Amino acid sequence: MRICVYCSSSAKIDKSYFEATEKLAKEFVKNNVWVVFGGGAIGLMGKLADTIIENKGKIKGIMPRFMNEVEWANKKVEDFELTDTMHERKVKFLQDIDGLVALPGGCGTMEELLEAITLKRLGQFTKPIVILNTNGYYEPLKQMLEKCVTEKFMHKKHLEIWSFVKEPEEVLEKIRTSKSWDPNAIEFAVNK
C-alpha cells in the first residue's frame, strides 16, 4: 500500500501532535505502507520521516527545488524527488497512491487537502481521504464542510469524499474500508 501524507512543518506545535504522528508512522511501518510526503525535516514532516526511517520503513519525499535550496529537505530520506513548482509537487503526491492522509497543519496542508477534496468531487481523484483529527484540530473544517452540504453548496453524496478519525490507529482501517469513489462523480459535482 502507498499512502500520501500531508502535514505540518512547524516545530513549535504541541507535543501531542508529534506523538500522534509517531504512532501513525509506526503503524505504517508495521503494515508495510510506503509513505509519500512533502520531504521536510522539521515539524510533523520530520517526525514522520525520522520515525519511518528509524523503524526501517519506506518513505519518499517530494519537494520543489526552491524549498530544497533553503535546506528544508530531510537529508535522511534517500528516495527524494525535486519538482519545479508547487503544482507539480501536488500532482506527484497523488500519483499511484492508495489513499491520502491529512495530519494537522497550516495553510499549506489545508490547501493540499482542499485541492484533493475538490479533485475527488470532480472525479479526478478517487482514493480515500482520511483526516486525522488529533485534539479536535480539524473540527472547524469538519463543520465547514458539513455546512457546505447543509447550505446546498455541495451535494450530500460529497460527505463520502472524506473521513475524519481521532486516533492514528484508526487511519489504515478507515482507508481499507472506505467506499470506492465514482470516477464519474463530475455528474453530481454541481448541486442542481
Task: Enumerate the language-model features and the residues they cover.
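A cross-family phosphate/adenosyl-ligand binding-site feature
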Residues: 1-96, 135-169, 173, 180-192
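Arginine/glycine-rich "motif VI" loop of SF2 helicases in the C-terminal RecA-like domain
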Residues: 53, 120-127, 153-154
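Active-site/ligand-binding-proximal alpha/beta "capping" segment
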Residues: 88-122, 130, 180-189
